[in-house]
Amino acid sequence: RKNEILGFLKNPLNDLCISRPKSRLNWGIDLPFDDNYVTYVWFDALINYITAVGFEQSDDKFEKWWPASYHLIGKDILTTHAVYWPTMLFSAGIPLPLSIFAHGWWLMGDSKMSKSLGNIINPMNLIDDYGVDPVRYYLMREMVLGHDSNFTMESFIQRYNSDLANDFG
């Protein structure tokens, strides 16, 4: 994924518009200098990373949690987090995360899991039925970091039976 970002950065970068007209959006944080616009959702969402750990509110808390050693994100939002977010931090004089890692997707039936598609599994139900350790084991065993992985109940039960029940008893 590093090469994706390096390739992106080889192209000229345009200014990032951080506002959206209210005529297109009926929600958002108002801009204090223009009543007709709201803040672009990714801009205000990214700021949450530092405000949640005390930026401009608690120096002790902020210094405890920032800079982030690892910034773990989904591969579909890599550019936002590896280009725009560091740019925002740098311009504010805030240290950048030390490492950014983009994880793959859990797929269900070869499609990205999505609440709107209804192709999801509730992990809490899985934990209730099988316990937290078997679920952790499956997730770590089946997903190669940075790549997509397909989840099926059949593969979960197969891994549970073959590795945990048979090998570890």
For the regions a language model picked out, list residue spans one by one.
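Structured secondary-structure scaffolds
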Residues: 1-169
